[in-house]
Swiss-Prot record:
Mg(2+) binds at residues 458, 485. Binds 1 Mg(2+) ion per subunit. Binds 1 thiamine pyrophosphate per subunit. Coiled coil: none annotated. This is 2-hydroxyacyl-CoA lyase 1. Keywords: Fatty acid metabolism, Lipid metabolism, Lyase, Magnesium, Metal-binding, Peroxisome, Phosphoprotein, Thiamine pyrophosphate.
Length: 581
């Protein structure tokens, strides 16, 4: 009896630690650096504990934006960011960010508070089957069974998020576990998980791929964001230059090899895809972005060489001639070695190169002609050509919107890998400001002086516009360009809008695509202490952007009015499903 009392007294005298602090320490041990979230019951203590250990916490205004930001950190750094949310509705708001991370194959950890375990099935505050709900949107979804179990679950979540094809993972933390105290000696932290193992393709398959590429009459390399994530820029650029091959980047593959490289045929995209006879896919999937690899966008007998980290991705939609399973950078080096040992170069004077150069020149001329129009309001091309003239070559470009993103991608150049973030594989609107905040936070430490330019359509800006307050609160010198056409796809000018309002019943007469004309979005920025500009002419755009780039002490929003009916130049093929409107 006395021994028992002595043991109990000893336990009480031992140093205690809360579940919140165990979570924070486990994250720190796994080299997690960034956390984004919206705090409240029961997760506030977790954010405070994380800050005590030096984990950077960025408080956002909406869980979706927080989740988008955390996922972008994962893409930019290769280590998952954490999204911290409250239970029930807070977690549900983050599901969009989890799905987006999974679709883009970006590492992400979502930590969600949940109702107390002893209230399960009783109708507890914000009770929801969170672990089950997150399984559809994640690689791994679990709830620690005890405080002692937390380090194990966190290590597994971090490891799962970065191993194989990266993706989202969810950790559910009941409210009672956050505040529960346990002896520090009972907690065993897991060692930091090792970097993902690098997998190489089979040597015979690499030789076969080199042979197919050597036999090509009209070759093309397609560089995807998987190549950017794996840091394959050096090996792919060497392959491009050694073999004199034309390449085409996907939207977030831009910058792996600079857009101004003479072998870039982005301006001849449709022609390159339609007539290539051998295509090498570097971490690019044959999904909707690449038109599934099917006719009429491609030749029926085109040969694909597919390089991907994920075996399940190989052969989707089209049977490839050669599959190279492995890390994109490692496999690119293997392929490069084949041509270093046995040099081969695609002839510069070939008919294929002549066709691509001519199409590239013609398309660039059409865009420049549209950009040179002096009429007001401005069109998209005029805006983007003036922006491109002033953008620093090392800046991050974040972009979302319909025409704003599609046209901007063709004009705004990327010269560095992992410096473009956009709607991505899921085509998600609302990612812009979250992505921009993530890029600015990462750049502040890893590449000081690099600016973040966030190019938003006016409709897209509306999804996460209140994150401007977050930007100002943390004084992130982000430049937001809102390309304002008064609508979704297209809008109306003030005169036409006034006539519409003369009809009775605005809910039945205002077209669904229309937004309020001449909205002063720049005042959202000035309301929180940043700088704002309302511009209507090329001269005003040039002056405001020049001032914004010069001032690194404050964020800025430039509200750029354009022709409400402005659209893209004529396309050879429709980008997505045709609309009957």
């Amino acid at each position: 009896m006395s021994e028992s009392n002595s043991a109990e007294g000893s336990d009480r005298s031992e140093e205690q630690v809360s579940g919140a602090k165990v979570i924070a320490q486990a994250l720190k041990t796994q080299d997690v650096e960034y956390m984004f979230g919206v705090v409240g019951i029961p997760v506030t203590e977790i954010a405070l504990a994380a800050q005590e250990l030096g984990i950077k916490y960025i408080g956002m205004r909406n869980e979706q934006a927080a989740c988008y930001a955390a996922s972008a950190v994962g893409y930019l750094t290769g280590r998952p960011g954490v999204c911290l949310v409250v239970s029930g509705p807070g977690l549900i708001h983050a599901l969009g960010g989890m799905a987006n991370a999974n679709m883009n194959c970006w590492p992400l950890i979502v930590i969600g508070g949940s109702s107390e375990r002893n209230q399960e099935a009783m109708g507890a505050f914000q009770e929801f089957p969170q672990v089950e709900a997150c399984r559809l949107y994640s690689k791994f979804s679990a709830r620690p069974s005890s405080i002692q179990h937390i380090p194990f679950v966190i290590e597994k979540a971090v490891r799962s998020s970065i191993y194989g094809r990266p993706g989202a993972c969810y950790i559910d933390v009941p409210a009672d576990l956050v505040t529960l105290q346990e002896s520090t000696t009972s907690i065993k932290y897991k060692e930091c998980c090792m970097p993902p193992p690098l997998s190489l393709a089979e040597t015979s398959a690499v030789r076969a791929a080199a042979s197919v590429l050597r036999s090509a009459k009209q070759p093309l390399l397609i560089i995807g964001k998987g190549a950017a994530y794996s840091h394959a820029e050096d090996s792919i650029r060497k392959l491009v230059e050694l073999c004199n091959l034309p390449f085409l980047p996907t939207p977030m593959g831009k910058g792996v090899v600079p857009d101004n490289h003479p072998n870039c045929v982005g301006a001849a995209r449709s022609r390159a895809l339609q007539f290539a006879d051998v295509i090498v896919l570097f971490g690019a999937r044959l999904n909707w972005i690449l038109h599934f690899g099917l006719p009429p966008r491609y030749q029926a007998d085109v040969k694909f060489i597919q390089i991907d980290i994920c075996a399940e991705e190989l052969g989707n939609n089209v049977r490839p001639s050669v599959t190279l399973l492995g890390d994109v950078n490692a496999v690119s080096k293997q392929l490069l070695e084949q041509f270093v040992k046995n040099p081969w170069q695609y002839p510069t004077d070939s008919k294929w190169w002549e066709t691509l150069r001519e199409k590239r020149k013609n398309n660039e001329a059409v865009s420049k002609e549209l950009a040179s129009k002096k009429s007001l309001p401005m069109n998209y091309y005029t805006v983007f050509y003036h922006v491109q003239e002033q953008l620093p070559r090392n800046c991050f470009i974040v972009s979302e919107g319909a025409n704003t993103m599609d046209i901007g991608r063709t004009v705004l150049q990327n010269y560095l890998p992992r410096h473009r973030l956009d709607a991505g594989s899921f085509g998600t609107m609302g990612v812009g400001l979250g992505f921009a905040i993530a890029a600015a936070v990462v750049a502040k430490e890893r590449s000081p002086g690099q600016r973040v330019i966030c190019v938003e359509g006016d409709s897209a800006f509306g999804f996460s516009g209140m994150e401007v307050e977050t930007i100002c609160r943390y004084n992130l010198p982000i430049i937001i360009l809102v390309v304002n056409n008064n609508g979704i796809y297209q809008g109306f000018d003030a005169d036409t809008w006034g006539k519409i309002l003369n009809f009775q019943g605005t809910a039945t007469t205002i077209p669904p695509m229309c937004l309020l004309p001449n909205s002063h979005y720049e005042q959202v920025m000035t309301a929180f202490g940043g700088k704002g500009y309302f511009v209507q002419t090329p001269e005003e755009l040039q002056d405001s952007l020049r001032q914004a780039l010069k001032d690194t002490s404050k964020p800025c929003l430039i509200n750029i009015m354009i022709e409400p009916q402005s659209t893209r130049k004529a396309q050879d093929f429709h980008w997505l499903t045709r609309s009957n409107i």
